[in-house]
């Protein structure tokens, strides 16, 4: 199977975790987009969705799925999203799509986090994929120096010569070269830096289930 076919396979498999009649959380990115397309086929079975980004909300609406504001609900049964990297313990790097803060917020409300990804995202140790950190724009340089002191190589994420701006009006610093031995500790350490909105480490609230696409089909891991 191609990488896209693997993503489609895990997106279809994730439908089994959708609880009928409830509101579900939906992530952001290419694999999440495949899931949204599958969700559109069963939209009459669910009450609606909470989106982790404006892009996700737009795609959900295009399928006729009702969007709910997270402030209007107390909890949700499941949050389904992709990952840039995931370990055998369920810790993840996320944020390649610049939606890490809202993804982390929505995931925190869900009873279950189902990660969907192609099998190449399963790693022994996090850190080969650059670690995204969302920052307040005026703190960009300050935070970058702090991240460099941790042993990483911080780079402001740019597109077309301009800093990428998140849905929250913030910037993204991608940190290369970090040796992430203890994801939960590093998550707390980076989140404590003044000016950081959040870091794209999902370790303290990692995945509960991972559906990983392989050439032989979908592998399921529980954490």
Curated annotation (Swiss-Prot):
Record GO biological process: D-ribose metabolic process; pentose-phosphate shunt, non-oxidative branch
Sites where the protein binds substrate: 28-31, 81-84, 94-97, 121
Pfam families, sorted: Rib_5-P_isom_A (PF06026)
Keywords in alphabetical order: Isomerase
Matches recorded under InterPro entries: NagB/RpiA_transferase-like, Ribose5P_isomerase_typA_subgr, Ribose5P_isomerase_type_A
Coiled coil: none
EC number(s) recorded for this UniProt protein: 5.3.1.6
Signal peptide (UniProt feature, chain positions): none
Cross-referenced Gene3D superfamilies: 3.30.70.260, 3.40.50.1360
Active site per the UniProt annotation: 103 (proton acceptor)
Domain of life: Bacteria
Pathway: Carbohydrate degradation; pentose phosphate pathway; D-ribose 5-phosphate from D-ribulose 5-phosphate (non-oxidative stage): step 1/1
Transmembrane segments: none
Reactions catalysed, as given in the entry: aldehydo-D-ribose 5-phosphate = D-ribulose 5-phosphate
General function of this protein: Catalyzes the reversible conversion of ribose-5-phosphate to ribulose 5-phosphate.
Self-association state and partner proteins as the record states: Homodimer.
Protein name: Ribose-5-phosphate isomerase A
Organism of provenance: Janthinobacterium sp. (strain Marseille)
Record gene name: rpiA
